[in-house]
UniProtKB/Swiss-Prot annotation:
The EC number(s) this enzyme carries: 2.5.1.6
Family: Belongs to the AdoMet synthase family.
Function: Catalyzes the formation of S-adenosylmethionine (AdoMet) from methionine and ATP. The overall synthetic reaction is composed of two sequential steps, AdoMet formation and the subsequent tripolyphosphate hydrolysis which occurs prior to release of AdoMet from the enzyme.
Flexible loop: annotated span: 99-109
Assembly and interaction partners: Homotetramer; dimer of dimers.
Name by which UniProt lists this protein: S-adenosylmethionine synthase
Reaction it catalyzes: L-methionine + ATP + H2O = S-adenosyl-L-methionine + phosphate + diphosphate
Residues at which ATP binds: 15, 173-175, 239-240, 248, 254-255, 271, 275
GO cellular component, one term: cytoplasm
Amino acid sequence: MAKHLFTSESVTEGHPDKVADQISDAILDSILSKDPLARVACETLVTTGLVLISGEITCKCYVDIPNIVRETVRDIGYTRAKYGFDCDTCAVLTSIDEQSPDIAMGVDEALEAREGLDDLFSRVGAGDQGIMVGYATDETPTLMPMPIYLAHRLARRLASVRKNGTLPYLRPDGKTQVTVQYDNGRPVKVDTVVISAQHHPAVDLGTIRADLIEKVVEPIIPVGLITNSTRYLINPTGRFVIGGPQADTGLTGRKIVVDTYGGMARHGGGAFSGKDPTKVDRSASYAARYVAKNIVAAGLASRCEVHVAYAIGVAKPVALRVDTFGTGLINEERLEKLVLEHFDLRPAAIIHHLDLRRPIYRQVAAYGHFGRGDLNLPWERIDKAEELRAAGTGG
């Protein structure tokens, strides 16, 4: 395979789209903490001085949405009017309906149950049709692609040096991007690092550039991946004072590639944040990552992409596909059979096995839903790896 470049981006928690994602998931978590069986599809829009919450929510509890919004925005760091967005003074509007009964009936009683199949996990149908994708690769410790792995770590570091006072002139909005050179399918060096960091107007670009390279880039990018030709593009427009919702309207679900694999894997198109686990956009994507990660951890492939497709109101997936891109120890048809034997991908089974009716979602609404070594996420476990290895190799 010839040498090639691959680029992935991440954003900080103060990016307007991520503000929206975190608000949606904070509302979801609050509801699930009181009503684990709630149906939630919560969408958020943030713009100058305004947060709009909309969607469909059916639950048996009350949550204080304006307070959740303000506390989430406060935690992110928009605490002063001069940032263009202030947790204490922004308006919070809500427009919420209940889940459509036509959708609810298919989730409450799956096609299989209506046809007489008496099985606990066949009672709950998928909340929508769609294609969900999971991916894993052995090129990083978290089994994530190197470009998104590094981009997320840079974004988290950028937020950390702002919050802990190391670089007090930074403000909440920010973006990172990493271009990695591959040789024969393996990452060999970092070609380009891009960081755009919102800042106080009085700080000059030279100071920002020097500080971000020293305090953000150097602690994160492995020395072995840096060369004399590695480029650093720090605030390449020259100025980033106006940011956050004042500069760009933020919407839930607008960073689906950042949330997943940085473009290295295909994507079915469904977003995650604000959705309870009966929405297979979320739960089945987590399950597909769980499957792919266990296949790679088992040594059955160096790279693995898992596709799962669903029909609304039907419990059993309508299709499964495993692609190892030529890295598989065994053929893909055999891998697909192993997946069906060792993983139950019906929505109720996913929810049960991964214990998804819990308030665990706000924590993944920024810096990626996958490969989070800082969190104990059920879909990141590799507890099936040994049995897959034994079944796949006959050992």
